[in-house]
Regions:
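Structural beta-sheet core signal
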Residues: 4, 144-146, 220
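A solvent-exposed, charged loop/short amphipathic helix patch at secondary-structure junctions
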Residues: 161-189
Length: 221
């Protein structure tokens, strides 16, 4: 009688397991708090297609660095067509430290997000996570709870210089800040709109998809 639970990226993982055919019968209940259904195509995960650069944090930028691997760009670009065992052996041979360092170096000069969940037709189909959740052939028909927090985005907006001013009344030597909201109405409006948007993409949309797939015990908070 196993219940899986995750928050934020963990909620994303819970939704992924609900869609993954390989996870069938491995758990009996699922809870996702503040999750989301973002998934990336193979090209987006690679970071480049035949026409343009799609994402500086894609695999092509990382694996092309000589500190990570000796693969040529042509080899990396066709990496997804390799046998899965060859892919596994290659990835296992890499240094985790060197991979992370390259990501840290690249992200200083980009606003791109690291591709996380890929529509690779291995776990998540090329249709994407949200459509897979609505697929009755992938339904696990177990009790599912999805939820979000009323002021979800206050965690980020509450420290953003556009909305608040941070004052150190005891000087920075005693780091006890006092936070002053510059425009309370503007701040409240942004928090509500962005938090409602998170609820829509992390609760409402996936629950609608699960209902289409035939789930009978769905709950939201």
């Amino acid at each position: 009688n196993i219940t899986i639970f995750g928050e934020s990226a963990g909620g994303h993982n819970v939704l992924s397991l609900l869609a993954a055919p390989q996870a069938k019968d491995l758990f009996q209940k699922a809870i996702s708090q503040s999750g989301y259904t973002t998934s990336y195509t193979k090209e987006e995960a690679l970071g480049k297609n035949d026409v343009q650069q799609l994402n500086d944090l894609g695999s092509l930028s990382v694996f092309s660095d000589s500190n990570v691997s000796s693969l040529s760009k042509g080899k990396i670009k066709n990496f997804n067509s390799e046998d899965l065992e060859i892919q596994r052996q290659f990835l296992k041979s890499l240094s985790a430290e060197s991979i992370m360092q390259i990501y840290l170096d690249i992200e200083k000069n980009t606003r791109d997000y690291m591709p996380l969940l890929n529509r690779d037709d291995i776990v998540i189909s090329s249709n994407g996570l949200l459509k897979d959740l609505a697929d009755s052939n992938l339904s696990k028909d177990i009790p599912v709870i999805l939820g979000s927090n009323k002021d979800e985005l206050s965690l980020w907006l509450g420290v953003h210089k556009y909305f608040v001013k941070v004052i150190y009344p005891f000087t920075r030597l005693i780091p006890i800040p006092r936070i002053k909201i510059l425009d309370p109405n503007l701040y409240t409006s942004w928090v509500k709109i962005r938090s409602d948007a998170w609820k829509y993409r992390g609760v409402d949309e996936p629950l609608i998809a699960l209902e289409k797939a035939g789930y009978r015990k769905l709950f939201a908070y």
